[in-house]
């Protein structure tokens, strides 16, 4: 069966949906994926995804683009989807825009989340609605595949069929060698929501603790604002090296060659989980039990504060997470991961 997954973004959400693609492929289905073009590199080359449909972000976001140009760009995507002749489509996002493309692809079977997971009336498009029975978002996504592969999501642990990214891994190893970084601790300084960013003072304290331990530190960033924050942390802590500008695959290469990743609830944290790199997740507005990494080699902290608050940092106290406690958790995660790898060797 030809199955289309509609998950347009973002970084972490794409990662969280990969186990669904793995389940579908294991059940013998051919998997296609519709996502925004900027996120396509995360899944391009995945061994379980046969076709990627790239939705031009400008066609969705850029109001300066002439209406006709936007219409033509979107029409090209719809025609491409219909030409693929999918047998089933899974709306793994649950928003109006994802539901629209799920409907326009013309697959006879449409599967999506039920209320309250589905929003913006998207549930009206789905002919098969999956109720939210699981706590973790990955398990919620995998449940969408049950109508097409019953019981598949109960077999074993999460699987993340990432691309090999061989060239990016070689590039990362060469860059780290030139920078003199061997098994560095990675601190991802930013996040998409202001309320998910560990306060600068805590990040400075964390890097200073690494300096006292003579532990190499790599400061990862994604936007210009995060780059400036990383520079400030480096200057104030007197330690750490800023990562270069990277694509998602290049960031994966840096993570794969590092000892541990410390990050808020954002794409890079979930990438570390998918790569099997030890990680410590710092959570605030979103519950760690819903979004956080789990299993050997992973630790999470949950700060007090308002649930799902995006912008008002006064309502989420990420500063309650102490730097020293994060160091201890990172050490435990690395030991646990090493023991797991050794036991399976």
Model segments located where?
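Catalytic machinery of carbohydrate-active enzymes
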Residues: 1-345
């Amino acid at each position: 069966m030809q199955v289309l997954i509609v998950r347009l973004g973002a970084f972490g959400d794409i990662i969280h949906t990969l186990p669904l693609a793995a389940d579908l492929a294991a059940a013998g289905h051919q998997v296609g994926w519709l996502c925004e073009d900027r996120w396509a590199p995360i899944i391009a080359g995945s061994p379980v995804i046969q076709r990627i449909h790239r939705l031009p972000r400008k066609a969705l976001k850029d109001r300066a683009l002439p209406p006709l140009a936007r219409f033509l760009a979107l029409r090209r995507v719809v025609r491409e989807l219909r030409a693929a002749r999918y047998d089933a489509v899974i709306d793994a996002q649950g928003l109006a825009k994802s539901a629209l493309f799920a409907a326009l692809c013309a697959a006879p079977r449409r599967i999506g989340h039920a209320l309250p997971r589905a929003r913006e009336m998207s549930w009206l498009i789905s002919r098969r609605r999956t109720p939210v029975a699981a706590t973790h978002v990955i398990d919620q996504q995998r449940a969408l595949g049950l109508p097409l592969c019953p019981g598949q999501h109960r077999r074993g642990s999460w699987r993340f069929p990432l691309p090999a990214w061989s060239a990016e891994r070689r590039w990362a190893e060469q860059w780290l060698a030139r920078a003199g970084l061997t098994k560095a601790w990675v601190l991802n300084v930013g996040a998409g929501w202001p309320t998910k960013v560990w306060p600068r003072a805590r990040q400075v304290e964390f890097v200073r603790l690494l300096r006292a331990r003579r532990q190499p530190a790599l400061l990862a960033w994604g936007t210009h604002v995060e780059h400036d924050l990383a520079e400030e942390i480096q200057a104030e802590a007197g330690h750490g090296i800023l990562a270069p500008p990277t694509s998602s695959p290049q960031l994966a290469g840096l993570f794969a060659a590092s000892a541990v990743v410390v990050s808020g609830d954002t794409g890079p944290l979930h990438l570390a989980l998918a790569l099997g790199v030890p990680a410590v997740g710092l959570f605030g507005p979103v519950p760690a039990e819903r979004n956080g990494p789990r299993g050997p080699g992973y630790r999470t902290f949950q700060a007090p504060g308002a649930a799902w608050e995006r912008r008002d940092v006064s309502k989420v106290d990420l500063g309650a997470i102490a730097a020293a406690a994060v160091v201890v958790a990172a050490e435990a995660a690395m030991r646990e991961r090493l023991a797991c790898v050794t036991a399976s060797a």
